[in-house]
Amino acid sequence: MLLLLFLYPTPLSFKSSDVKNVRFILCFKYFALYLHNKQKSNNRMSFTEHCNEIFNQAIRDYHVTDNVDTPINNPYDIESIENRLYLKCWIDTVQWHFEDLIRDPHISPEDGMSLKHRIDRSNQDRTDLVEQIDSYFRQLYSDITPLPDATINTESPAWAVDRLSILALKIYHMKEQTERKDASEEHIKKCKSKLNILCEQQKDLSLAIDQLLDDIQHGRKYMKVYRQMKMYNDPSTNPILYKKK
């Protein structure tokens, strides 16, 4: 009803005796607008809710084939943060299954070494992508002037998002364990307990990330990003590689 009052046009001409009625209608119209905007604000997803939705989508998409060689089909525009988040979780999901495969006790030395190289490349891709996401945040908050007493966080937003992506994977696979038909009741019970803890951790981490972003946006915290500077993949810093030159 309030929304209808807001949408209904106010008469342009009226008698002086109608002033009170018009003011009353205008008050209702502004109040309806306030409620409408408040409802829109309440319905807007937080950043981490958006992340978790995208992470779950990537995990589901991967498990359609459940094959580490499945080509990615990223549904988001290449310039968007959603594209980076989807790619991040896809890399994490593939690497999760790399880690399963390499622990096969019957894997041949050749296949194991090949898989180890793929894991190394995946780790580097993951690190590069996290740094891209941090660059997004730095650009997003580039106009924010930190308050004089602003503090720094223990990790950058993107590395916290990295942990959130891994948590989504843990929750997915732990839930799988609770639904196994070939497992004992004791196994199912333990996995359900672990699943509850993981879900609580996801809730807490999501809140912490959203609070961190709010603090950065309002100048209470500031970003300071350190590149990972991994050495084992760099031929100039890994002694096994540079000594063979």
List the predicted regions and their residue ranges.
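Short, positively charged and aromatic/hydrophobic N-terminal segments
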Residues: 23-25, 30-36, 41
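Generic signature of intrinsically disordered, low-complexity, basic-rich segments
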Residues: 6-7, 15, 28, 54
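Compositionally biased non-globular segments, especially hydrophobic aliphatic-rich helices
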Residues: 13-14, 35
